[in-house]
Amino acid sequence: MTKIFEAEAREGKEITKILHPLVSEWFFSKFKEFSLPQTFGVMNIWERKNILISAPTGSTKTLTAFLAIINYLVMLAEKNQLEDRIYAVYTSPLKALSNDIHKNLIEPLEEIYRLAELKNIKLQKIRVGLRTGDTTIAERAKMAKKAPHILVTTPESLAILLTTKKFVDYLKAVEFCIVDEIHALDNKRGVYLSITLERLNEASVIWPVKIGLSATIAPLEEVAKFLVGIADDREVIIADVKMEKKVDIKVLSVGNLIDEGNLGTSLYNLMDSLIKEHKTTLIFTNTRSATERVVNHLKEDFPTEYGDDTIAAHHSSLSKEHRFDIEERLRTGKLKVVVCSTSLELGIDIGYIDLVIMLSSPKSSARALQRLGRAGHHFHETAKGRFLVLDRDDLVECGVIQKEMMEKKINRVYFPKNCLDVLSQQIYGMAIYKIWDVNELFSLIKNSYCYSKLPRNDFFDVISYLAGDYALETNNIYAKIWYDAKTGQIGKKGKMARVLYLTNIGTIPEESFITVKLSPSNEPVGAIDEGFLERMKKGDVFVLGGKKYIYLYTRGMNVYVKATFDRSPTIPSWFSEMLPLSFDL
């Protein structure tokens, strides 16, 4: 069984002693001293110990994870010993977060290189590569030719890379693996990642040190086991960094909830007054459609206060360029208010926020804390948040969540177990890479926390299903792998195996999206649901990214539109999923 230990804080002078002079000079030019998470984490990572660091948002967890790794790579770079391989993998559940880390990792490295030039110290170039769903084909090809030393990616992209011989060769001696925002993986994406981490272990000739970063969650022991897996020879240290941050959280009712006559007007008047009282406000809704609706209403109800230069919508259906532009404008203080669904919940750096508004119940105290942590992102600042409730159910839920937050009670995370759909997908991906002995495959899967108690019969049922032992031809479901019961081996079947795998990877609910482009410039704006498009006719006006567009025509998988400013939307809203209520709540 996996052994768990409690981390102990180390002295600042002990950490300083292991830092390369360039890294030390850079660090103390930015920070006065080591933060609490750094005193718990840096030395353990340097000593190659698996560690889970749990601390509130804004407590420098990410830098804690990277500091020892950057230090190690700078030492190798000075000795001209950097090889063309991946030394560290950083995986996060958000594409936006990966982009942010990429940016914030490159900048410290560039500053360290400038210091080296001033001191006439020659350093090899430390390469950082970003591989997500947004990465272009050209960038992927460039990465395949020359491996990055630090790979920033998502769980799904990492699984894809582990089916590619070139990248598996680059990962043969990977030394570090950072799993950020681990609390956001208490779902089938987490289950998927748990096997991907075991695949990474199998691909590497050495054990990749696991570094887990999490907001304040419980139970930490189970999360730590999820990080390193289940085996007698595995150990993990837990750094539960308790940092008491001042919290100012209130539940505000929008008008009279008994007489629900004119709540819309009351809601936007209340929002406007709260926004005006603060410098920068971040508003969370629970769906993309609500995000668009709020931005549109604020623009129409208060046209002199809110325009494209002061307010923006942010969600996953916007184009990469639009998302990055909004994040940058928010970070630099150019926007007064940003409305988002869940896309800015996690630890992406968005600059100074002094108020977080949560429209309706966030459905769990853990999510509410994560959202609240965006306000006063630095530790010494007060996190100020307001729940705006629109009905009595919301009032009860938000009241309970507020009480849990004030009492420091955290919703427990639960990782699903023995998900056979995820298992089928992972086995298929592994068979694409190479021929496996089924007993070795079963042992690898059993090391995953989420499959440590997987019945052998269930495993072989999945193998039989993938091998086509079930008569499913009438449903156009055919064998994906071959299985030889005599030799106990499996492998891929068919020339289209990789294409099938790549086009069906992951556990994020499938949505059929159509790209929205401006006419005649062909500039991508975002994407809309196919079902939403079916309801539109030529000339309809809809909202995307807080801006209004007139639908012109559809060509292939693209919708062509032109911007409008004086017309109101003619089609109500588009579709997106609601958030689930947490089990504890």
Predicted regions and their residues:
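Walker A/P-loop
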Residues: 62
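Helicase motor core with emphasis on the C-terminal RecA-like subdomain
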Residues: 2-15, 22-25, 39-40, 46-52, ...
